[in-house]
Amino acid sequence: MKISKRQQDIYEFIKSEVKEKGYPPSVREIGEAVGLASSSTVHGHLARLEGKGLIRRDPTKPRAIEILSLEDEAETPNVVNIPIIGKVTAGMPITAIENIDEYFPLPEYMAAGETNVFMLEIDGESMINAGILDGDKVIVRQESSAINGEIVVAMTDENEATCKRFYKEANHFRLQPENDALEPILLNNVTILGKVIGLYRDIR
């Protein structure tokens, strides 16, 4: 099957991203990888690849590019679908959301073989100095304890959840924001829901 050099580069980039990360790149990422500034040009190449049966796209979903002729399938990482439980604030505490909204396909190696991993969407800017931004989805491993300085999702006695850096001090627990403009939350009691072990950010 004859395809252009540019289309081959795009196809190989998509294939390598799927193998490495478990999910396809965005149109913007494809453009940056192959030196195309115009998203419409990237879409044109994707349409040609789709027309030749090399990929399949779902126009209703972002990043929905499926490789139809993936060689060396054994090298493709296994993916585990982890629940996105809801939003958790990185600013003021909000009531914890326990209903599962959707699932996210996480490469198995990122879950380290554990089944007690979930995602929460960050709402707020109090963790920006740690690189956790409003709208990010944090990957959380369920744990009931933490070491000072670890970033956790914690629940207070008022059944409110928040994402902060954890410190156990002499007479209280301190949930420290990573934003110089905000004050820490001091609590007599706190319940650790889990440790933040990673994050996902949509850069589109």
From Swiss-Prot:
Enzyme class: hydrolase
Record carries keyword Amino-acid biosynthesis: no
Alphabetized Gene3D superfamilies for the sequence: Umud Fragment, subunit A, Winged helix-like DNA-binding domain superfamily/Winged helix DNA-binding domain
GO molecular-function terms, A-Z: DNA-binding transcription repressor activity; sequence-specific DNA binding; serine-type endopeptidase activity
InterPro entries: ArsR-like_HTH, LexA, LexA-like, LexA/Signal_pep-like_sf, LexA_DNA-bd_dom, LexA_repressor, Peptidase_S24_LexA, Peptidase_S24_S26A/B/C
The enzyme's E.C. designation: 3.4.21.88
Catalytic reactions of this protein: Hydrolysis of Ala-|-Gly bond in repressor LexA
Cross-referenced NCBIfam families: lexA
Role this protein plays: Represses a number of genes involved in the response to DNA damage (SOS response), including recA and lexA. In the presence of single-stranded DNA, RecA interacts with LexA causing an autocatalytic cleavage which disrupts the DNA-binding part of LexA, leading to derepression of the SOS regulon and eventually DNA repair.
Protein name in UniProt: LexA repressor
The organism of origin for this protein: Listeria monocytogenes serovar 1/2a (strain ATCC BAA-679 / EGD-e)
